[in-house]
Amino acid sequence: MKEKFSNRLEGMMSTYIARNPVTGKTQFMQNWGDYDYNASFGGLPALRKYIADVKAYGMMPTFYVAGYLACATTRAGQKYGLDYGIMPLSTSPSSSVAPKGYLDSYGVFNMCPDNETWSDYIAQTLRRLAADTAIEGVRLDEFGWAKPACFSPRHRHIFAEPGHNENMRAQVNIYRKIREAVDPVDPMFSMAAEHYGYDCMARYMDWALDYDVRNNPDAVRKVPFTLFRFYFPECKTAEYNDGNPMMPEYRLFNAWAVMHPNDPELYHITLLENGDAFDSRDVEPLVRTLRRDVYSHRFSARGKAIYTFFNAAGETVKGGVLPTEPAAGKHWVDLLTGEELKLTSVGKQTAVALAIPDQKAACIARLPELLKVKRIDETLLAEIAAANPDTFLILSDPAGNELFRATAVKGKIEIPLAALKLMKNCPYTVKLLQGKYLRDMTGFEF
């Protein structure tokens, strides 16, 4: 290892060498480029079964593909590496085995995306994977970031003129080709990248990683947020989480997806149950609030409006925060507690009153009044104003755990509290869900 790779790469490459659990032999596990099926693991039939098992579990299986990289040990690397690898203006080889003049991040060929041959190869490879395995999506690693300009004399560039860098434009072209190749196989095939790049690229993607919190220090701003998430909501962003203790609050405030989430289950449930609003195009970042350094976003859908907050004021904020007007048949609810929120006056304005601790997020909603509850001894009587066949009544504890569920019908439903063994003086929530999404919500204390 030390003979072949520099100190910078030695540690990285050593993690790619592992014992094959089937054969017992040590092998290099990161053979980027071919994306064939490992015979020692059972080949394509075993992979198809594994993918089917993942789907049966209720999860969406996707592949990782390093669309920029090709190991010299692979057929792809041997066939395309020298002719279509990136040759930057200057190089600092990271390993003594890298061909002179080639970009060799990760100790392998870094392929130029700005040529027809490699872009066609990636598109047709993904078409094959989708057809062979029934995988439901792919994330192209390293895509969404620009690579150095390529000065190789061994291939013709589609977009770049000599000395120019059209790397991002070339990536867009690859995504277009992938869509054209894969959509006939599976029009619901999910496309993702390591970053969303820019709007022309994101139009072909369903989601992308983001490094906003990880790469941008909090010292330069009160709270992180990404305008891209609001202006192009069809391309979801998944913030890369490296264990930042503030990530749960940032996630709730921005309604982000997060890689390796460390948020409370209640936050996760709140995001899922209001996915219709968070997935909507009717969104507005940084709506006006009545308190300095208290920030808010709006997400609306199906007659409800969700407002998330982040308090960067340096102290707990209490009282009127969000300007509003009374609306017949609507009420304000704290989605984390089920507490009914009151309207108050701030000067000449009507505002929603709530309390938000410093450096914490909050999530409230203006909902249609469809649900009322009343406790009679050991029974909770829920009165439902309207319900469809796919509507459910759910009782949850303060952590969001579901304790009771019943099909909701218009009229009254009795919930036997004694049988649920609820804790005294503890707040609980009752929710009305249509399908997966919240329609109305209220709270009560046992």
Region spans (language model):
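Catalytic domains of carbohydrate-active enzymes, especially glycoside hydrolases
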Residues: 1-25, 132-136
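Active-site-adjacent "subsite" loops/lids of carbohydrate-active enzymes
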Residues: 38-39, 46-52, 61-133
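Glycan-recognition surfaces
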Residues: 76-108, 112, 168-269, 290
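Aromatic- and carboxylate-lined catalytic core of secreted/periplasmic carbohydrate-active enzymes
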Residues: 246-308, 357-366
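Carbohydrate-binding surface patches
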Residues: 290-327, 388-392
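C-terminal beta-strand-rich structural cap/linker in extracellular carbohydrate-active enzymes
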Residues: 344-376, 419-424
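Short, aromatic- and glycine-rich surface loops/edge beta-strands on solvent-exposed regions
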Residues: 362-365, 393, 423-436
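Edge beta-strands of extracellular beta-sandwich domains
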Residues: 367-377, 405, 436-446
